[in-house]
């Protein structure tokens, strides 16, 4: 199941239209909420994400830290989950224990930072 979280109704409607135009009619859910509320909803429903892709507007840099911290403390991430954050290449979204950045890709003015848990189940460092 792929879950899209979008606070903008127009953007959520565009996601739905794009999926429909591709012939995708199932296997997804569009959650119309801000990231914090959506994370709480998804966590309460017992979901565990394999991948989380963050792409808040570049102007909302404070949201990166809040969202990474919320994800790091949530039950949404399993031991092998990967968090990918898109951001301006000049901006460093930082880390939120136990999430550690293990890769950064830069393309033009944009960058992708990849995170995963820094410790395994027994506390060993990865």
Identify the role of each PLM range.
Residues 1-126:
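Class I S-adenosyl-L-methionine-dependent methyltransferase catalytic core
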